[in-house]
């Protein structure tokens, strides 16, 4: 039974520079802050950062997997608060979790959280699913 307060199982995704390159190629977003460490540092970032929409896509996958497919996801929103930092030659985690905050008929509202290296990267994130 799904009820208010139900905690969804946490999922950890891993990102590295190769994934950022593949995402940049697929999305057409070749902004050098996502691939060039020297450039990222020159504009005040701590290192190369993941594409925000890649981070949001991982959270979306988490929700759609839980909902039994993308068709069950009726609403999805998030607020970016910190970038996911991806140093060279390292895999970094994006850990996603959720808690049911409302159940009305067949509509379930989930409050979502995403962290990387223990730092909150998305907040005020919410999904509404039909299950």
Question: Locations of the language-model features?
Answer:
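Generic structural detector for well-ordered beta-strands
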Residues: 12-14, 79, 128-130
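HotDog/MaoC-like acyl-thioester-processing domains
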Residues: 1-8, 88-131
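Hydrophobic residues on conserved beta-strands that form the core of alpha/beta folds
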Residues: 10, 73-75, 124
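Hydrophobic beta-strand-centered segment that forms part of the acyl-chain substrate-binding groove
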Residues: 43-46, 56-95
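Generic secondary-structure boundary signal with a strong preference for alpha-helix termini
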Residues: 17-18, 40, 56, 64, ...
